């Protein structure tokens, strides 16, 4: 018998066929458990914001600036300057952001982990992060990898003569890959199963192929057609919240510096970091072409240098773009790229490693899109003729690119946060009045309940306001009271007619209260909306025999329509909200999957989701006042009836004939119809994990626990966006 056969540990714990292998369509609740304290190596009570505030940012930037021009033999710097490499690193960290669900981006240092660390578009960025290790090692916990990656991009630009718009710190690292981000369903790199129809890109994706940040630089699927490439550019950049001017500025600004790498065939390049041998120590793409580095480096397979000043800010990109007519050629690796007709400008570009050699300018297919596309060309020519406008546009677009997923300005830390307030930051006025106290809160609750507005409407309005929050990009939430503004006031899920009546009632209470105060005391509508929900829950709990006080912290303010970018908020309109039993249409994914997706964006745990759904149902807070899932004979009373009845074996459930998402529950003894429910309702009895939690709340001794857990989860959602309160 071999030694291997005798070993009792041929297969390690956690290996073998998984539940997901057996049941690939099983509801994935794991995304509600990611990034727990069990994965976090930092001490309990570690406060990254406080650590960053104690950081000598100027010293870090000084060290980064010095790093730029100290070329390392193990990965030499092009042109003696790492600026281009570090700009690409920061860009590709931030550029994964997409507006559809707010996921991706540079906010948590995900570029360190799979799959991003091994994407084809991120080839050799592992070297960039290794170059940064001595600086990360020096400053330790005072600066996260997430902040360091973005800051390094800024310093790279500044070290090459560009004036950046600013920098805000505060990106806290996570310690494992995100499990919630849908990067596509393709199983091979650079596949594009994500398209349907005539180039219709699947939502929420914002890249044309698996493993790319945005577009294929050779053109759609490698077709070197600048006009068709422009279509892809416009769509993908728009899904990252960039308009045409910002898009042109980013492409031209980024391609003012550095070069691409395609010294030889891709067949020489070894496996990516996640597939490389352990001896590679987390690095990948070892190349057997020549030295495998420097002038022999292979990254994208393209060998392009755009400008005559690749380590200095200039307007040379546009001079070259419009100064030559371009013809198609191929890189040494065989990739499509462009050179001037007749090899014009043959000696205008420096060689990255040999000062005695010169090259001609080269461009990517996607660069020529800025000249071929009529809208892009108009902007490009304006930037060409007005370098100051170009510099300002690039500075602003770069700042937006690298900060778009950070949420409101109140989260930005450090001395370089720009004073200017930008519309994409979803600005909210600072508190300018004395806040209401406990006595005022009690009086206002009484006035709200005295109006006779049903508990269900008070609760659903507060939920509609707060549940827009996305933990992904920290947008949305009750602060700002944007539920009263376009576009949210008109979203179908918010039942505009009912919403308008509730808001009118609350506005009357606010106006009466504010006009009767002295000393500058006021209540905002944003606060009053949340307080109304709290009052409704307290009344519903009291009806159920529970005297509970729902926590409330004032200090929210009301944003104006002018502070609200309608287009930017439109992408946040829910297609589903399982907490309100709302489903806008028919989708490829199940309603319960959309519930979990919504819950993850709300940073909820499995018990919190369970408590909230059960509570919202008995509070009668469904969209359209449907009775699906309202498993109680005493609606608007906060009880555990939902769980008691969804777990009741006296009910037999059957799908309805005309709706796969709707079910009818019949009394097993009498055959009479008792309840109707959706997939979101029945999943709490069907899914083994959710049923286990539902059983806790369905027990006879769990009535008080359920109320307390519901209130705690409710309070969490109401305050998810209160970053300004945390920083007071």
From Swiss-Prot:
CDD domains: catalase_peroxidase_1, catalase_peroxidase_2. The record marks 88 as: Transition state stabilizer. Formation of the three residue Trp-Tyr-Met cross-link is important for the catalase, but not the peroxidase activity of the enzyme. Residues 338-362 are annotated as: Disordered. It comes from the Bacteria. The keyword Oxidoreductase applies. GO terms for biological process: cellular response to hydrogen peroxide; hydrogen peroxide catabolic process. Its cofactor is heme b. InterPro entries: Catalase_peroxidase (IPR000763), Haem_peroxidase (IPR002016), Haem_peroxidase_sf (IPR010255), Peroxidases_AS (IPR019794), Peroxidases_heam-ligand_BS (IPR019793). One of its GO terms (cellular component) is cytosol. Its EC number is 1.11.1.21. PROSITE patterns: PEROXIDASE_1, PEROXIDASE_2, PEROXIDASE_4. Signal peptide: none annotated. Homodimer or homotetramer. HAMAP family: Catal_peroxid. Belongs to the peroxidase family. Peroxidase/catalase subfamily. Bifunctional enzyme with both catalase and broad-spectrum peroxidase activity. This is Catalase-peroxidase 2. It comes from Cupriavidus pinatubonensis (strain JMP 134 / LMG 1197) (Cupriavidus necator (strain JMP 134)).
